[in-house]
Amino acid sequence: MNKDKQLHNDKINLSQLVLLGLGSLIGSGWLFGAWEASSIAGPVAIISWVLGFLVIGTIAYNYIEIGTMFPQSGGMSNYAQYTHGSLLGFIAAWANWVSLVTIIPIEAVSAVQYMSSWPWHWAKPMRYLMENGSISTYGLLAVYLIIVIFSLLNYWSVKLLTSFTSLISVFKLGVPMLTIIMLMLSGFDTSNYGHSASTFMPYGSAPIFAATTASGIIFSFNSFQTIINMGSEIKNPEKNIARGIAISLSISAVLYIILQSTFITSMPQSMLQHSGWNGINFNSPFADLAILLGINWLAILLYIEAFVSPFGTGVSFVAVTGRVLRAMEKNGHIPKFLEKMNEKYHIPRVAIIFNAIISMIMVTLFRDWGTLAAVISTATLVAYLTGPTTVIALRKMGPTMTRPFRAKILKVMAPLSFVLASLAIYWAMWPTTAEVILIIILGLPIYFFYEYRMNWRNTKKQIGGSLWIIVYLIVLSILSFIGSKEFKGLNMIHYPFDFIVIIVVALIFYYIGTTSSFESVYFRRATRINTKMRESLNNESKSSH
């Protein structure tokens, strides 16, 4: 009894969950996003942030229903296999894991990049961390060290993790808010938004969509899955998963939109007249802007924040990625030793060590922030394509399952989120779409090796449940290749008719995806998890009375 009480007390409450969510959401994205978005789209970039929030919010809506039905660690690596079998489960989990394991080095790279531009005299040796815009050999050692520290903070217990991220989250929220106040007081010029449609949208309407994916806006918002992947470690998950996602996503959206507005209105007119929005070249955008406006103390604080903010995100994602890898092992298509949990602290230590090694390999191969960001965005969006089809298939296959959060307008939201995820992949522009296919191809031989070891048991059925997404990704890549010049295609389909084609094709494949589900051993496992969750709810209800 005492042991159960201790385990319950060790679980994450709502306030800790919101701070953990914000710790993941507010990382290097806010430090780069506003500048990147305005350089692509100009003042209309503010609409790109609203659009990014709507895209991710719509996708998250599907996952809240599934996440509350199956509260488990690393949940997002399991959902697709429950309805469509192990191959689709593997594709979704592989894409999700690739995106998550790449967030660990991108945050370390971001911290090191800002360290290299610290203005203090004693920090001069830090300049050797960067070389021609990429991490140098010395910089790599610093990145490795930061990845090790991220991992060590996750190595002992959930309590240590939440204590650390709660402390950092308070700082991460405070500095952007202070930045907003000081920059608005020092330079607030609403005329920077322009006086007509042509000055508000200096580069046309297409960059509104391009900025949503290409400037790191989707990347900045997609961390809502941190909360879902912590599943079984959350107190009252049936209520707190939905609340945690809604609160942390909404707070971060408001913060990001105000930051973008502050960046636009604080920009000196002389600089805009000289180079235009797409000619502004900052190394550390908000710190450089603070120096331009003569607020040197704020610039120094921002240099410190630029180290702390990615640090908090990196720590959060080591926690999530370890649990995702452990969940993938239950699929039976990656080595069993990765599933091992530390009995005392209930932490997947082997998975954490393995992810740290992979993170180091990734950053050795891709040494700049932009390349790592491209890998994250495309892989994440592929994983998200399976959410809407899974939640609809579950409604058909398990109508009597307990749903603590039942999405009310799912028949609209599921196809809408599938279409939006498809468009967001297209907005990433050619050739990023083709790189998604490569990421999946790299994973498939691992899957088929384990199918071979299992004597190809039910392999034909698994392919039948998953072929639609493989074909769809190839079709999306072809559409990106022949699409409009605004999205780096051959311009065989002109803008905005390319969007109409994507929407129609997406709805066709969405329908095929929802009708490709079948009952398997994984669905029976899902039924057991849901039954256990219902019993837990009933027991809690009885004890409260």
Question: Where does each model-flagged region fall?
Answer:
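Membrane-helix boundary/coupling elements in multi-pass transport proteins
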Residues: A95-S110, F221-I234, N296-K336, R367-I392
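Membrane-interface "cap" regions at the ends of multi-pass membrane proteins
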Residues: M1-W35, I40-V44, I56-Y61, Q72-S73, ...
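Extracellular loop-to-transmembrane helix junctions
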Residues: N9-I12, F32-Y138, I251, I258, ...
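TM-loop-TM module centered on a large, flexible mid-protein loop between adjacent transmembrane helices
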Residues: N78-Q81, G85, S116-W122, R127-Y128, ...
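Terminal cytosolic tails of multi-pass membrane transporters
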Residues: M1-K11, V391-M413, A434-H545
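Helix-loop-helix junctions that connect adjacent transmembrane segments
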Residues: K3-N9, I46, L51, W122-T137, ...
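Loop-to-transmembrane helix boundary motifs in multi-pass membrane proteins
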Residues: N9, L14, T137-Y144, K235-E238, ...
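Membrane-interface loop-to-helix entry segments
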Residues: Y138-D189, N222, I245-L249, I376-L385, ...
